[in-house]
Amino acid sequence: MVKSMQQIAMTQQKTLDQVRTFMARTYSWMAAGLALTAGVAYLTAQNEGLAMQVASLRLPLMLAQLALVFVLSMFAQRLSAAVAGALFVGYAALTGLTFSALLFAYSPAAVITAFAVSAGTFGLMSVAGFVIKKDLSAMGRFFLFAVLGLVVAMLVNLFVGSSALSLGISMIGVFLFAGLTAYDTQMLRNLALSGISGEQAERASINGALALYLDFINIFLFLLNIGNSRD
């Protein structure tokens, strides 16, 4: 009986260690991606000639970003960890290039404030998603359709040009991606609890980092827009 309880305790501890390792690897990839994006954006903005060239190539760069996200998402199980990592790094760098325009459009104070609030919001919701007992998996379809609805509203506003609609979209966007942060974190935790390991775990941590990275980036962009709307 005692031996059986010890074995159970050892198994539980091993599982907890696997979860910690997996989540730490995921957050490390995400943090590295954000750092790379920030660094590339800053360095690009410091070079006026490069910044102007990037601005002229904005559409091709955005299409390249979409292509990388598509490949990482759709072929996650076929890519090696090395290739997935390289694609993630490439995506973060491309995002940095396109984000360099933000440093011209917004004041340093606005960017720093939005980043700080984004970090706080992301951190709280990620912790909530990790520790909450309620199963959030059923929310997946809701989040999918909510994001699609948000994209449609943003496309409509490109033609309408309503500042009120833009503010409303941004406020909904912050809440939506805050919720997605909790959802994605719980899905990653559950994946780690399933006993995933080796190359498969490495690939999953990179794709998980991409999901969390996108959650953070969207929260940041919507908060920037909210701050700009109130100025």
Curated annotation (Swiss-Prot):
Pfam families: Bax1-I
GO cellular component: plasma membrane
Main location: membrane
Keywords: Cell membrane, Membrane, Transmembrane, Transmembrane helix
Segments crossing the lipid bilayer: 26-46, 56-76, 84-104, 112-132, 142-162, 163-183, 206-226
InterPro entries: Bax_inhibitor_1-related
Cellular compartment(s): Cell membrane
Membrane-topology descriptor: Multi-pass membrane protein
Biological process according to GO: regulation of proteolysis
Single annotated GO MF: calcium channel activity
Keyword Transmembrane helix attributed: yes
Family assignment from sequence similarity: Belongs to the BI1 family.
UniProt-recorded name of the protein: Uncharacterized protein DR_0893
